[in-house]
């Protein structure tokens, strides 16, 4: 009988010792397949995918010079003239106390305007004709849909057809991107805007593209690599057709450097900088003499 009691006591003790281990086993978290070092692969953002898609078509441009200025006053540093038209705040154009960050373009003849008007969450592009000395009520630009968020800084080339503007949205690499569209005379509306690609655009904000066809000069306004409330104005030589670096078979790191405008000196191989600087000097001189 004593032996039976002793056996039962030993068995009970063994079961008691096993219970914590079994409880731990039941409560133990299961490791994901692949072991404890497995990390979920992060998917690239739509902006990153768009950037990689645009990279091979980076435009071959020559950037002549650059200037860092206050974001609030960058229009004052672009030498607008009779050939290319003028730009100013929409608040000044409509003579109302509204958001002064939105701008208006007026053509060289002074009889046609494109204005951006709205607030920080929503804006729209409008056009207005000057008839008998008075500006007509602005009408929304046909063809520029709401998928282009908070559009601003419209600029139209002297052909009266090609329009550039900045906007946010799903077709943007990051923040504001620059877009180009042309007016379809037959359909009486603008064609679907296209992203200008690199190096016009970046993962930062790219606000304005203005072109003086007569002097063969262009201005790109962006806040890439700049502190808050500052922008960089790049002066470049525009091309009548888009040229790329595809035939040069550059390493990806070099192509990305050119796409990001890491050094304007690296782009001087793409044109005659001295000739372009002379055109810029003559333009500034003629503007100062007026």
Where are these regions (language model features)?
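Bacterial Sec-dependent N-terminal signal peptides
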Residues: 1-27
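Short, conserved micro-motifs composed of acidic
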Residues: 26-290
